[in-house]
Swiss-Prot record:
<feature type="compositionally biased region" description="Polar residues">
    <location>
        <begin position="654"/>
        <end position="665"/>
    </location>
</feature>
<feature type="compositionally biased region" description="Low complexity">
    <location>
        <begin position="712"/>
        <end position="738"/>
    </location>
</feature>
<dbReference type="GO" id="GO:0006974">
    <property type="term" value="P:DNA damage response"/>
</dbReference>
<feature type="compositionally biased region" description="Low complexity">
    <location>
        <begin position="478"/>
        <end position="529"/>
    </location>
</feature>
<keyword id="KW-0808">Transferase</keyword>
<feature type="region of interest" description="Disordered">
    <location>
        <begin position="440"/>
        <end position="802"/>
    </location>
</feature>
<dbReference type="InterPro" id="IPR011009">
    <property type="entry name" value="Kinase-like_dom_sf"/>
</dbReference>
<dbReference type="Pfam" id="PF00069">
    <property type="entry name" value="Pkinase"/>
</dbReference>
<feature type="compositionally biased region" description="Polar residues">
    <location>
        <begin position="440"/>
        <end position="459"/>
    </location>
</feature>
<dbReference type="GO" id="GO:0106310">
    <property type="term" value="F:protein serine kinase activity"/>
</dbReference>
<feature type="active site" description="Proton acceptor">
    <location>
        <position position="130"/>
    </location>
</feature>
<feature type="compositionally biased region" description="Low complexity">
    <location>
        <begin position="588"/>
        <end position="617"/>
    </location>
</feature>
<feature type="region of interest" description="Disordered">
    <location>
        <begin position="908"/>
        <end position="937"/>
    </location>
</feature>
<keyword id="KW-0418">Kinase</keyword>
<feature type="region of interest" description="Disordered">
    <location>
        <begin position="325"/>
        <end position="415"/>
    </location>
</feature>
<dbReference type="InterPro" id="IPR017441">
    <property type="entry name" value="Protein_kinase_ATP_BS"/>
</dbReference>
<feature type="compositionally biased region" description="Low complexity">
    <location>
        <begin position="666"/>
        <end position="696"/>
    </location>
</feature>
Amino acid sequence: MDKYEEIKTIGKGSFGRAILVKRKSDGLLLVLKEINVMEMQPKERSDAMNEVNLLSMLDHENIIGYYDSFILNGCLYIIMEYANAGDINLEIKKRTLQNKTFSEFEILSWFSQICKALQYISSRNILHRDLKTQNIFLSIVNGDYFIKLGDFGIAKILNSETSLASTVLGTPYYLSPELIQNEKGYDHKSDIWSLGCVLYELTTLKHAFNAANLPALVLKILKGTYPPIPSHYSNDLRNLISSMLQIDPKNRPSVNDILELPFINQYLGIPLKPFDSNLNENNNDSLNISNNSSGSNNSASNNISSSTEVKDQKFQNIPLAMARNINNNNNNNNNNNNNNNNNNNNNNNNNNNNNNNNNNNNNNNNKSNVDDVNSSSTTTTSSSIVKSKVNTTVSPPLSPKKPITTTTTKTTSLKTTPSIKPTLVKTPTIKSSLVKTPLSKTPISGTKNPTTSKITPSIKTPLPKAPISSKTPTRLVSKPTTPKITTPKSTSTMITPKRTTTTTTTPTPTTATTTPKKSSLSSSSSSSVKPPPPTTTTTTPSKDRSSVNTINKPMASNLSSQISSSSSSSSSSNSQFRPTTPSKERMSPTSTSTKSPTNPSPTLSSSSSLPKSSLKSDSLCTSPPRFSNTTGSSGGIGVSGNGNSNVNSTVLNRSVSSLSIQHKPTNSGSSSISSSSSGNNSNSNTTTNNNTTSTTPIRPGLKSTKSMLELSTPTSISTSNKSTTTTPTSSRSNTPSTGRLSLTTSIPRPPSSNGSNTGSSSSTTTTPTKISTTSSSSSLNKLTTPIKSSTTTSTTASTNSQTIKKSITPIKVTSQQVDSTISNIKNNIVIGNSVSTKTNISVISHLSPSIKPLPTQSIITQLPTSASTASTASTTNTTLTSGTNTMTTKKRTDFKLDDLGHRSKLNSVKLSSKSSSPIKTSSSSSSSSSSSSSITDKKSINRVKLNNLKEKNKEIINNIKISSTIPKPSNINSSSSSAFSDLNSSGSSSLNNSLTSSSSSIITNQNNQNNQNNQNNQNNQNNLKIINELILQNNLNNSISKENLDDKRLHSRANALRHFCSSIFGEDKFKETYNLLKSQSPSTSNNEIVDIASIENQLSQLIGDKIYYLKYLQQLIYCESQI
């Protein structure tokens, strides 16, 4: 570093910076790259060293030169050549700001030098892999531009001629398709793609492939789509770019093929001058102007003064000369553009560009007094025309009294008489080279001597108008006339309202309106007007025109039927047919609903809406319904609906009777049961006396004498004197008239058992509808529920056994209630009192004879669900209906004995366990006043047996009190069932045995549970041992993995130090120094001093002044010793 003087930092990267330095020995400017290799990963460190090795191998005039490299303080320093003119990317940015493109000469001069550099590295099997404009540097040497290819940081040396690389690197704008796909690898053709992108960017100043995001950019590259190249470049250059940007690498040319092209080979060795030093000469050379200039240009330049306007005129002559050159090649488009840029006073009233060019040429003839006309008019093809212009408009050329000074203003000073000031003539002329029709050779009509005559600008030549009108389409601008009704955006002929067979449309493009009394929509309309969509319309203004579409009529009818099914408005039962009326917003103001003879809307009867009604039961008819003349809709079961009734006509097929019940709980705790039944006799109606008025509103004009009850057996219908109902039967009533019964009852809680009851009872409902019916036959079974004395029961139609089973709800009983009840039974048995005078048990009765009764044990052992109903049942008195006499005394006695034994057993267990948790049992039991006598006969026996039981089981009870476990309900239930069987067979004697067996089973279960707890504890201890072992194993694995991680770090550091030291000392000296330091093995203090001194002498001879880097070698040896 002492040999170089740092000037400034010219670039920074992630691991270092580029510094401009000056060599102190000769003052040469160089670039010093400082790279911190100690902070790099091994891959990045190898890339840095790779660049050093590559630069040291390369020596070419178009590649950045390599001078030296060294490592200092953990940083790698590379000394390389300095490119004093920046890079190509900087030049492209300058041209973009100046809005100037590169000439083809500049592009190909640079491109040939880049190809030479690529040819050189390809010959050494080196891929650059990051070829872009930022890595192509410019250097000015002896006043000429030279290309310098640099930045070989990610270059790769191929091992053989046919090897392929497989790493995706480089800038995304210049990536080749094979690099993106990374499937088959890539070779030198990938650098050709990047070179094509660079060449495209030189021609257009833009990237060939550019997008807003990376996926879009990748898609464009894979498709190979790029904007076209400007047309002012040669076809050879455009074809070359196209061949280099081929998707298939095999179709791309090699570097040798490109350099062998004739138009590329001619630029090899030609120096390129800097752009800022002599831009004008450079442009003249690039356009080859000197070869095309004539002697007349020299004579014309003598008359131009050396003012500031002369420079402007000179720059303006450059595109004129280019236009002359292009005109010789039959390119008239560029000629017209250049002439338009040179003239400032052209007349733009005419739309033909050729006439403007001719006007500009004539203005130049009137303004300038120049000998050579070719300097201002370069498109003439006839020499005779030029001579006539000279004789008529230009004075003698060599007269010293006639100088002209050309300025950028609109006025020119001409040599004229003092009294006359010439004006600019804006006369359009047409030359034979631009207009195909021949013209006269006189260039200006009406002017012969411009120096003596004054010509006004209003004089125009009418000759060129004829050929223009015949060749070019004109725009006719007419005065605004009376507006006509036409179709917007239509090029057809306008149709006047006089013709009645066509439709004159208004400016609204989507609606076709008709003119009243003048025109109508018909099939013979004009072809210029599109036919309207096929709709049924009429031409009379009073009718509906196009609001109702025949396609939408079924949908409208369905919509009307759905609306009519939920409406509650009343209508007459004999109402007429009413068709579908379209919605008001789709109708015109004058439209009325009319019948459609081809597609009439269906009748909105009660049977037409049956498929759409939400029926939740199986009470629908299987036969197709008949249509009636009334309109309405049938409601579903259990919901309010509107229906019509016609006594004389059968609406539904009554061949199949159906019945359904829906249980709907309400907010107040009541339930709504809705049943429906149909019978064969549809005309049987029952008239009742109206003692209780229904709360259903009766609309005026509706009959209220028809009953809604149609039962399966007409003879079984009976009514009570206190509970009647009156339901209207009009077409808009809220109760369906299709033979369905809708009852709403108030039930405090569902029944838990069922029994038969044939007696009739008068009952009233508590719901607002107050509909109640009674039945005296077996077909109407009663659901009797135990309720308080303040509530009444309600009757419904008979149901099947499956519905009754679903309605049974278990009752939850608390432990306090069980304790009080068992204690009462115990006291009654011991003291001898009657059970009926002490117990308060809710008896639930009773199943109908037609339904199979449930088993006794399943009723008693039913799981509880509600505590509120149980408390009500335990506090109220026993309620029995008049139908309990159907139960036999034997069944009641057996049932009571079973219940008594079960409760006695539960009482003993409850007293012994003293458990706080509630014991699950069933509160559903049946009692009767007739069963008290049988229990009283055995009270003395039960008292003696109970005393003996207490003495014999005292020890068992004490053991149960000590135990903390609670017996399972399943064990209690199983022991209860055994106690019931023993009690039924042997009376009170078997009760003792059942209690003893139940106590022993409880003890056995307790022992089993203790054993299970011990086993669970043992399993938990085993699991803890396993968990501890797993934790130890995990810690051991973590320590091992940590040691492996440390070894891995030591390995990576040792490899980095070995590579670093090898690059510093060289491979041979590194091995010798490494072996020398590693062989050092101190034994004693004296020997250690002698060894160190001898080793230092040897090291100084081996490495010389690089002894500073021995510390890195020592670190390497230390890392290897720790691994």
